[in-house]
């Protein structure tokens, strides 16, 4: 048996795990979006699968006497094959600088547009909040029928933001949200470089230190 053949089951396992995580996230967003769902983290533990849900309205996601969380846990276990799902719901407003979560920014823009606020005004508000939160870089793109019958897009970019390579895939946060308005469907894409992120090509040069005086 070749080395590639011996490694194949490992790769298959990784692909299956990533596929399952994607399915879980898709289901959670579909089921809980109207209750203020923002994002989620999926962590494997010795006791099963821990799912951390970030939400703007945690009480609505939990439901009366935990009814919604219990329903979601049952579907994850029985239909998606998630091993012993344990769900924690965290209020995103209690996290330091929630504006650095792209889903938070995208949903706020979408909700404001749904209320009739002009898209440019909402984008500039988001830009101010991101700069105040200390983002190293960001990009906000709103696409759809913005001013004419033809679809177009409006984009605001600031700071340092990678779009390709390792940093773009693993360190830059990205979210896409769609909202249905009277003229049609609009897309909001947000990419954020967090304030605490250190790029893989970023380094600091320490200032030279004076050698200690030679012993007399």
Swiss-Prot record:
Residues of the signal peptide: none
InterPro entries: KH_dom (IPR004087), KH_dom-like_a/b (IPR015946), KH_dom_type_2 (IPR004044), KH_sf_prok-type (IPR009019), Ribosomal_S3_C_sf (IPR036419), Ribosomal_uS3_arc (IPR027488), Ribosomal_uS3_C (IPR001351), Ribosomal_uS3_euk/arc (IPR005703)
KH type-2 domain: residues covered: 24-93
Superkingdom in the source lineage: Archaea
A molecular-function term among this protein's GO annotations: structural constituent of ribosome
Keywords: Ribonucleoprotein, Ribosomal protein, RNA-binding, rRNA-binding
Keyword Ribosomal protein: yes
A Pfam family it matches: Ribosomal_S3_C
GO cellular component terms given for this protein: cytosolic small ribosomal subunit
GO biological process: translation
PROSITE patterns noted in UniProt: KH_TYPE_2 (PS50823)
Keyword Ribonucleoprotein: yes
HAMAP family on file: Ribosomal_uS3_A
Annotated function: Binds the lower part of the 30S subunit head.
Family under the similarity heading: Belongs to the universal ribosomal protein uS3 family.
Subunit structure: Part of the 30S ribosomal subunit.
Protein name: Small ribosomal subunit protein uS3
Lineage: Archaea, Thermoproteota, Thermoprotei, Thermoproteales, Thermoproteaceae
